[in-house]
């Protein structure tokens, strides 16, 4: 049986024979948390779950890096927020006055979005609170006492060496409040002297938490403080001579702690662009949960190896992704054949890793997203009518073919209604114009040729006198008519769309027509109303 990469990581970690495995993750709270920079927690959770499956104790720790300096004003804040640049996120006021501070304003929606993922044994930490509560005090003391060696380690990977009076600490300036413009140059006991680019000179007692270790030292210190045994992180940290390489040496030599098992991952781009909180180019987990269930986000993350490039689009490509997920689900339940046994094992394992809970005994009802975008608009969102459209177009699984909407089980009904809501939200927010339509109650003002009128007339007669088991049969019948008239398919289908929705384009014609009330279509094609 093939193994998923999260399983292999768990098995390798288990060789360490620890009483508990703590999988670390962290996110900088510089604005809205998006799926591009929050993969850490989802990967960490998956590894923790795999460890527990093989009988190990494991938990996930997520650290909010909320003491880092604000470097850019995040979207959609006004530009006058630039006055807070350089200040720790934790010390910046809430932009709307609804939360305690900047951090809570952006962190709260993300943390709430984690609830549907049911992350077991999750511990959430605040970097700022860790400093303020003295958690980093001992590590800061050790780092300062070993400044010379830390400087040497840094310089091995720098083009320009650090100054001789450099200290691995960033004080918060008591004058301007910035943390990234101060230069710590001397210390005595717990007091650190610093100069700030604003012109202020001062001292800070590091036990008060009014400053922080420089990043690569902080990361190494955090590993030891929290006993981290494995940590996923973005590929930028994994670059040669990057954060992980430097922090690993510091962890080994300065803090006498083995660096965690690294799991670097590729960033997720959005429609080909790098996600950027400052530019407003991002897609959040909470946005995902409005158009898809949490398992589908897991599937998106875990279907490929972590360093494989990933580009996400919430537009038409999202429907393709949902089609893929549904296919994988059918294969996992033995409802569809995979191309070979190897593919079956691989896809089934991906599906299992993607699940929040154990797989239900029966495969969930999975009406096609793509078909629902059409059925939803025809039925104006009426669930009963949508179900009837699915039934009339052979879109129901065999076990539901003779089940009415009213008789659906609670599980099937909830699944169906939830997917309808997802499709509604997708249409409202991301559906392209060419996907959207409205069935016109009255004949729209249109121009059609005599040839198109004849085509519509013949189709109306066929609908009146013949029955079709599926849309394929009706599609073939329409082609017989247009070929007998010597018409181009485009002209024929334009006539259908023009008379029903007043547009030249629309959904797949055969299933669309069969989804509508037959008497309505016959009258409309005869141009009677």
Swiss-Prot record:
Its EC number is 6.1.1.6. Keywords: Aminoacyl-tRNA synthetase, ATP-binding, Cytoplasm, Ligase, Nucleotide-binding, Protein biosynthesis. GO terms for biological process: lysyl-tRNA aminoacylation. Pfam families: Anticodon_2 (PF19269), tRNA-synt_1f (PF01921). A motif ('KMSKS' region) lies at residues 274-278. One of its GO terms (cellular component) is cytoplasm. SUPFAM superfamilies: An anticodon-binding domain of class I aminoacyl-tRNA synthetases (SSF48163), Nucleotidylyl transferase (SSF52374). ATP binds at residue 277. It catalyses: tRNA(Lys) + L-lysine + ATP = L-lysyl-tRNA(Lys) + AMP + diphosphate. It is an enzyme of class 6 (ligase). A motif ('HIGH' region) lies at residues 29-37. One of its GO terms (molecular function) is ATP binding. InterPro entries: aa-tRNA-synth_I_cd-bd, aa-tRNA-synth_I_codon-bd_sub2, aa_tRNA-synth_I_cd-bd_sf, Lys-tRNA-ligase, Rossmann-like_a/b/a_fold. It is found in: Cytoplasm. Belongs to the class-I aminoacyl-tRNA synthetase family. This is Lysine--tRNA ligase. It comes from Methanosphaera stadtmanae (strain ATCC 43021 / DSM 3091 / JCM 11832 / MCB-3).
